[in-house]
Amino acid sequence: LFCKRQTAFLPDNPDIYAFMTGIQFLNFIADIFGVSAEDRQKRIREYADRFELTADLAQPIAAYSHGLKQKLAIISAWIHEPKLILMDEPFVGLDPKAAHLLKEMMREHCDAGGAIFFSTHVLEVAEKLCDKVAIIKQGRLIKAGTMEEVKGNDSLEEVFLELEAE
């Protein structure tokens, strides 16, 4: 239980209870993780404002677009302030402004001592955000290390394409 409270997982296609409203869902997740009423209210307000989701929280999730569902899922992953966040393709469905905000949140989380593992096919995002990187081919780790160790003087895309050709 302790480990679960320290982690969050954001799948590439999160299952969100469509019969709930956004605020009901976030309160449900906060209840699961024991987030106090005061902390949850503050965090929901902060993240919903940042993602411009506040006006939509009273609406049923069934009416949300893919992008709104993704924003809600991101907030639900952050609501209990986990130390480790695992994300699978977190930028899919986000508009450019929300994607930029997520990048900022990821950097803030790491700067505050947290860690994030995420998968992406957008190598420029990995190159800009990551301190360490791993390249996986057909389920096997083929290269890993700091960004400098992996890419040297090349771009991450060039390294990836070279490794794919092997």
Label every PLM stretch briefly.
Residues N27, D31, D39-D56:
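Conserved ABC ATPase "signature" region
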Residues P60-G67:
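Conserved ABC ATPase signature
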Residues I85-E89:
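Catalytic Walker B motif of ABC-type/P-loop ATPase nucleotide-binding domains
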Residues A99-A112:
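Helical segment within the ABC ATPase nucleotide-binding domain
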Residues A126-K128:
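A short, surface-exposed alpha-helical micro-motif characterized by mixed small hydrophobic
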Residues A144-G145:
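ABC ATPase "signature
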